[in-house]
Amino acid sequence: MSKPKVAFYWCASCGGCEETVVDLAEDILAVVEKVDIVLWPVALDFKYKDIEAMADQSIFATLLNGAIRSSEQESMARLLRRKSRHLIAYGSCACTGGIPGLANQFPREQILKFNYEDAPTVVNEHKTRPQLVFEEDGRHPHLPELHQVVRSLDQVVEVDYYIPGCPPTPKLTQAAVAALLDGRLPPKGSVLAPDIALCEE
């Protein structure tokens, strides 16, 4: 019997959620024995076209961390929603927008102007900014568009479960993955975490 397919993906985040998965240490080996990891850009080399070629709903579960800030992130969130039976908002940024959501206090233009022109550590005499499309040596690279606002994952696609934390602890992650694999899932929309604060443990 084939193992359930699992994907990990990150959007606008710091990388701490990915680090938690790595911090499972030897416990990750037990997870890897039970699943087939089909996407994990931080650790393994997979291409978007590989995911696009998969049948819809063929990924058992995707843990997606990070807020949605760019056109590429939104596109991947929509693709992974379509390909996954269970889409899990993993970490504070995916659940609520987290620290990246603080950017919503400022217009996009103000953020770009400060970062590329006005910050005290920036030297940019020509006021050059990244362009969505440009030509260089006969190539036409495309960059993702930065959206006007930062959104949580459930503001873009339907989310099945939430795993909170900044980042979620390895213990919480392991328990949530075990619940998924064992079929011990609460109703959709539930938070896969205890009802107590982390500091109470």
Language-model segment annotations:
Residues 1-201:
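Iron-sulfur-associated redox domains of electron-transfer enzymes in respiratory
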